A protein has these predicted regions:
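Short hydrophobic beta-strand element within catalytic cores of glycosyltransferases
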Residues: 369-372
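Short alpha-helical donor nucleotide-sugar binding micro-motif in glycosyltransferases
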Residues: 118, 339-344
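Conserved donor-binding/catalytic core segment of Leloir-type glycosyltransferases
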Residues: 4, 247-266, 272-275, 287-290
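N-terminal subdomain of nucleotide-sugar transferases
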Residues: 1-80, 89-92
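Membrane-proximal helix-turn-helix segments that form the acceptor-binding/catalytic region
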Residues: 173-210, 219, 223
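Nucleotide-activated donor-binding/catalytic signature segment of Leloir-type glycosyltransferases, i.e.
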Residues: 301-331
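Conserved acidic donor-binding segment of nucleotide-sugar-dependent glycosyltransferases
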Residues: 384-385, 389-396, 405-410
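Aromatic "clamp/platform" in nucleotide-sugar-dependent glycosyltransferases that forms part
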Residues: 352
Length: 446
């Protein structure tokens, strides 16, 4: 059974062999591919993988002796913008050119590039990770729908509606210099999600099979394509989160971990709005945020580059006197990310919308107390008062109340964390998820 994966990133295992920087995102893809490869003799799956590469000309297989066939010239046959990278880490790998800076744009040339890859690899099944990418739409125009499995991720049709996340109207509409130069203020970012949602809807309509994991993504995708067969497939997360465990005595008291805050949808501003109420009860509370510091500037030049959301966060931090309370950690690899969780007393997700956020799953695997907005598919991951605490999106008073509740009740926090860990080990069971994926592949092939 030949299965071609269509991914939005180059897997770290491939990047390492090519001597290229690895992405910090989508670590669960590596876990899933490792499960397939470790059981290759039993499952009979011959994997291939293709992914967008911004600088296709700079993508060479010369860094590794294991790549076998070597890279094709820039034009593969008569099709420019695609390269066969060779046999890497047990799979045939292909890179193709795509405008990664403008994911809302669809270019017809993508179809030709993917058609070349499909013709070369000859897959029985094409597994597309994410319906929201232009390359997924292009693939549905190349391969018959009965051979296509799309793994549902964020669902941009719904993200577009939630994107502004209750920010003041004038903040959504304003243009700073950076926004003017990039033609990219908050409202325009929202419009880009609208366009991606249109492509996503068309891609889902062109697929015979959909893989999801929440009641929410099942309901939303059904409205787009009621004829597609829906398969339940939970995610296998990064290995380190299965190996370590949160311990109250090892964490910093009243330290909150927030996994990402560089755009409105993630809702960091909600947590900032909640901080005055939290600080009344726990004045030593601090927030640690993974990811880029979009609020930072240390020079006039950097100040001119700050985006509208970054400036809004910075202004709110100053307004509430949080300059010494909010810390940005930068981009973290899995081990450092795990350590950031473990050093914190609780994890908060305040997103305006999520499907099944990996950050919540990772916190649950570690056995951490979790406070999350009750949005999208989150309630398919945890039950309020059982494995975590939920609050209504945007209700910052409730967010502050639930955080203070966990700070003040160590027993409750530990009970919720233990229950969260038990449930997450079922949801994110690597062996079970691998078996489920294999069953889906066999069903499609038959």
């Amino acid at each position: 059974m030949r299965v071609l994966w269509l991914c939005n990133i180059m897997l770290p295992m491939i990047a390492g062999k090519l001597g290229l920087p690895a992405s910090c995102n989508e670590g669960w893809l590596t876990g899933l591919m490792e499960s397939l490869q470790q059981n290759k003799e039993e499952n009979g799956v011959e994997p291939g993988i293709c992914f967008p590469v911004e600088n296709i000309a700079g993508c060479s297989t010369e860094a590794s002796a294991e790549t076998g066939t070597g890279a094709l010239p820039e034009d593969a046959g008569s099709v420019p913008g695609v390269r066969k990278l060779g046999h890497i880490e047990g799979m045939e790998a292909y890179g193709f050119s795509e405008d990664l800076r403008n994911p809302e744009r669809y270019e017809n040339a993508l179809k030709d590039r993917l058609a070349w890859i499909v013709e070369d690899f000859k897959p029985d099944i094409v597994h597309c990770f994410g319906a929201e990418y232009a390359h997924t739409l292009a693939m549905t125009k190349v391969v018959p729908k009965e051979k296509i499995l799309i793994g549902l991720q964020g669902l941009c049709t719904e993200i577009a509606k939630a994107y502004p996340a209750d920010l003041p109207e004038h903040i959504q509409k304003r243009f700073l210099l950076r926004d003017v130069l990039r033609h990219d203020n908050i409202r325009l970012q929202q419009k880009k999600y609208v366009l991606r949602g249109e492509h996503e809807t068309e891609a889902i309509k062109g697929a015979g099979h959909l893989a999801g994991r929440t009641a929410w993504d099942r309901a939303v995708s059904h409205t787009m394509n009621p004829d597609a067969e829906y398969h339940i497939l939970n995610e296998t997360l990064r290995r380190v989160f299965y190996e370590k465990r949160w311990q109250r005595e090892a964490c910093m008291p009243h330290r909150i971990f927030f996994s990402q805050g560089n755009y409105p949808l993630k809702g960091l501003h909600y947590l900032l709005w909640a901080m005055p109420d939290i600080l009344k009860n726990y004045p030593d509370t601090e927030i640690y945020v993974a990811g880029d510091n979009v609020t930072r500037y240390a020079s006039v030049k950097e100040k001119l580059k700050i985006g509208s959301y970054g400036k809004y966060l910075r202004d709110e931090i100053v307004k509430y006197g949080l300059e010494e309370k909010v810390h940005f950690l930068g981009r973290l690899q899995a081990e450092d990310m795990c350590d950031a969780y473990l050093k914190s007393e609780l994890f908060v997700s305040a997103s305006a919308l999520e499907n099944s956020p990996n950050s919540v799953g990772e916190a649950m695997l570690l056995g951490m107390p979790v406070v999350s907005s009750a949005v999208g598919g989150v309630e398919s991951l945890l039950t309020h008062e059982k494995e975590g605490l939920l609050f209504k999106k945007g209700d910052t008073a409730a967010l502050a109340e639930e955080i203070c509740r966990l700070f003040g009740d160590c027993r409750l926090a530990e009970e919720l964390g233990a229950a969260a860990r038990a449930r997450a080990f079922v949801t994110h069971d690597a062996e079970k998820n691998y078996r489920q994926l294999l069953e889906i592949y066999r069903k499609i092939e038959s």
